């Protein structure tokens, strides 16, 4: 049995299989999930698990080169926008929400949280550890 880190076997496999520039989406419970990416649904109830909980864990486990968000998060969800800016030392890349949704089609996986606040979504772009 795995002793630490992310125990979810689906997430652990996706992380182990990532290559440089591959992407993972962390989604609120309302984001449409396209056909193609692996769907990992963690939602239990509204708000559980939260966007911030899941994102924090993934940032600990994954080499992240940059993060993309919908530009609308800046005004519609200041709390999660500030969280991302503090949790990630580099500037966030922002695109309009329709472009963001289109980008999810190329992701290796979409992790659905129980988060129910506007634009609580991000795309993590894999970096390298060397």
From Swiss-Prot:
Subunit relationships: Homodecamer.
Keyword annotations: Carbohydrate metabolism, Cytoplasm, Isomerase
Protein's recorded name: D-ribose pyranase
Catalytic reaction equation(s): beta-D-ribopyranose = beta-D-ribofuranose
Gene name of the record: rbsD
Binding site for substrate: 28, 97, 119-121
Family membership: Belongs to the RbsD / FucU family. RbsD subfamily.
PANTHER family, A to Z: D-RIBOSE PYRANASE
Phylogenetic lineage: Bacteria, Bacillati, Bacillota, Bacilli, Bacillales
Species annotation: Bacillus pumilus (strain SAFR-032)
Annotated catalytic residues: 20 (proton donor)
């Amino acid at each position: 049995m795995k002793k630490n880190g992310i125990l979810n076997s689906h997430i652990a496999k996706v992380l182990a299989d990532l290559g440089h520039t591959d992407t993972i989406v962390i989604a609120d419970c309302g984001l449409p999930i396209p056909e193609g990416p692996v769907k990992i649904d963690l939602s239990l109830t509204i708000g559980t698990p939260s966007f911030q909980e899941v994102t924090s864990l993934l940032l600990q486990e994954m080499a992240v080169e940059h993060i993309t968000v919908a530009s609308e998060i800046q005004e519609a969800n200041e709390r999660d926008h500030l969280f991302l800016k503090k949790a990630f030392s580099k500037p966030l890349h922002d695109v309009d929400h329709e472009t963001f949704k289109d980008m999810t089609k190329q992701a290796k996986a979409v992790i659905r949280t129980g988060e129910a606040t506007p634009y609580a979504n991000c795309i993590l772009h894999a970096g390298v550890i060397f």
